[in-house]
Amino acid sequence: MTQRTVWQDFQNGQQYMATWPMRKELAAIFPEQRYIKATKFATRVMPAVAVMSVLSQMAFNNYGALPQAMTVALFALTMPLQGLWWLGKRSRTTLPPSLAIWYREIYEKITSEGHAMQPLKKQPRYLELAEVLNRAFKQLDKTSLERWF
C-alpha cells in the first residue's frame, strides 16, 4: 500500500468535490452533498471570520484577547481543510458490497446503452461511484434511472 500525504488527501478531496453529482436524489443516501456544500461555504466565509476575529480585537484595543482571537482565526481557517480532508479520504475508501453491486449495475446500464466507459473496477471506490453516477445522470434518461432513484 502506498503512503499518501495530507496534501494528496486535499487534492483528492477537491477532485471528488468536482466529480460528485449534486443531485437531490443522492442527498438522502450519501452525506457527500452536505460535506461539499459545507466545504464550499467554509471556503468562502471562514477567511472573513478569521480576519474579523483578529481585527475586532485590535479595533477595540483589546490586545489581551488577541491570542484567543488568533486561535479562533486558526480554527476558522482550518474548517475548509477539514472538509477537503474528509472528502479526500472518502474518495479513496472502497465501496461496501451493497454499493459495489449498485456501482456495477449502473456501470452495466451505461455500457449497455452504448456509452464508452473506463474499465470496470474490481474494488470500486467512492470516486469511481461518483464518476459512474455523474455519467448516469448526464447520459441516461429518467426512465433508465427510475430503478435506482
UniProtKB/Swiss-Prot annotation:
InterPro entries per the UniProt record, alphabetical: UPF0208 (IPR007334)
Subcellular localization(s) per the UniProt record = Cell inner membrane
User: GO CC annotations?
Assistant: plasma membrane
Q: Which domain of life is it from?
A: Bacteria
Sorted keywords for this record are: Cell inner membrane, Cell membrane, Membrane, Transmembrane, Transmembrane helix
User: What membrane topology does this protein have?
Assistant: Multi-pass membrane protein
Task: Decide whether keyword Ribonucleoprotein is in the record.
Answer: no
The keyword Membrane belongs to this UniProt entry's keyword annotation: yes
Record field: transmembrane: 41-60, 65-87
Q: Identify the HAMAP family for this entry.
A: UPF0208
Q: Which family does it belong to?
A: Belongs to the UPF0208 family.
> Could you tell me what this protein is called?
UPF0208 membrane protein PBPRA2797
